[in-house]
Amino acid sequence: MAASSASTSAIQQRVWQGRIPLQIVLSPSECRIYDQSDPYIISIPRLSYLPFILPRLFSFFSSSLIDPDVQAHDGWFSFEGVPLKWHYPVGLLYDLYAGAEPITSKSLSSPGSEREHYVRGGTRENISESGAEGEKDDNHGHDHEFKRDALPWRLMVHFHDWPEQDLIRLDPEGKILHDAFINSVKEADCLRNGTAKRIMALSKEDSSGLWKSVEEHNLPAYHRIHNTLLLPTPPTPFRNIPIRIFLPAPPDSPSPSLKVIQSPIPPLIQPTASPSSSISSASRQMQPQVQTIGTALNSLLPSLFPSKRTPMLAKPVLHGAVVPMSAPVEEVVKCAGYADGWLGVVVSMVG
């Protein structure tokens, strides 16, 4: 059963309220007093991007920098020695690298859990609200204690030694970051509608307004442009779901690289009648089935998700929360997609 418009808007608002506290230090090799400079503390929206705070960081650390000629756009971030891709939202980077245990509906029901959830960087709303009515998930058997030392997320900022093999350089005007975002929006639009005509038809004012709404973290302005002008007009369904599955490298991996799975996923699973089926059985099978998180993951990663209903070996994590396997993918992307229109699901191993 599709989530109501009010429910979708409420969950989207909760997702936009999600924030992550950061503690950022200057690279000791670039600091006049080595590792003795004060850290920069900030709470940043999960849907935001790290380069947005580079001007503030540059101003804060400028008196400690050895090289007076570096500029704000020379900055890049690392976590435990791994360069962080600046075109990924902060929340996605945190889910990928910080290693905190994701929230489940069971942990949210425990005393004090809502505050714990907000403090450790998740969204207040349980994404299961977008799940199909009448279905039940077994997401509760793999809960763990919170990793309380995961926040604030401790990052390092550098203004020298740009990792050319890992990151594309930024520019003073922010055009490269803007173009990367718009290109991602175009790709998502093409998957949703079968064409990128909607975003290509946006006026210059609306195109600039979409980017500005992300920079300023302005949900009403974003909602007016993205949800009104780019999403298919109801009741027209999505052609495909813009979804990326992120597989972090295993602990014993020689490199910190991650694998990204991306494939067209339709919102409905078309029926396939078996030759041996009875007429009544075949009639039931001829009805399209709603594509859920579980069916999508089973299709893309059957070895990690052998069951379409139960997270036996791995869990799908979105915005710091475990997504119910029965949640319809189209409803999830409408209410919990990132600002570029994509679902960024992180695979977290069970146990």
UniProtKB/Swiss-Prot annotation:
Q: How is it modified after translation?
A: Conjugated to ATG12; which is essential for autophagy.
Organism from which the protein derives? Coccidioides immitis (strain RS) (Valley fever fungus)
**What family is this protein classified in?**
Belongs to the ATG5 family.
Instruction: Quote the subcellular location field of this record.
Output: Preautophagosomal structure membrane
Family annotation (Pfam families): ATG5_HBR, ATG5_UblA, ATG5_UblB
Q: Where is the composition biased (Basic and acidic residues)?
A: 113-143
Lineage start:
Eukaryota, Fungi, Dikarya, Ascomycota, Pezizomycotina
Q: Which UniProt keywords apply?
A: Autophagy, Isopeptide bond, Membrane, Protein transport, Transport, Ubl conjugation
Q: Where is this region: Disordered?
A: 106-143
Q: Name one GO molecular function term.
A: Atg8-family ligase activity
Which purpose does this protein serve, as stated in its record? Involved in cytoplasm to vacuole transport (Cvt) and autophagic vesicle formation. Autophagy is essential for maintenance of amino acid levels and protein synthesis under nitrogen starvation. Required for selective autophagic degradation of the nucleus (nucleophagy). Also required for mitophagy, which eliminates defective or superfluous mitochondria in order to fulfill cellular energy requirements and prevent excess ROS production.
**Is Coiled coil one of the keywords UniProt gives this record?**
no
Q: GO terms for biological process?
A: autophagy of mitochondrion; cellular response to nitrogen starvation; piecemeal microautophagy of the nucleus; protein transport
Q: How does it assemble?
A: Conjugated with ATG12.
Keyword Transferase recorded: no
Crosslink position(s): Glycyl lysine isopeptide (Lys-Gly) (interchain with G-Cter in ATG12): K186
Provide the gene name from the record: ATG5
- Specify the protein's topology with respect to the membrane: Peripheral membrane protein
- Name the InterPro entries for this protein: Atg5, ATG5_HBR, Atg5_HR, ATG5_UblA, Atg5_UblA_dom_sf, ATG5_UblB
What is the designated name of this protein?
Answer: Autophagy protein 5
Q: What cellular-component terms does GO give this entry?
A: Atg12-Atg5-Atg16 complex; autophagosome; mitochondria-associated endoplasmic reticulum membrane contact site; phagophore; phagophore assembly site membrane
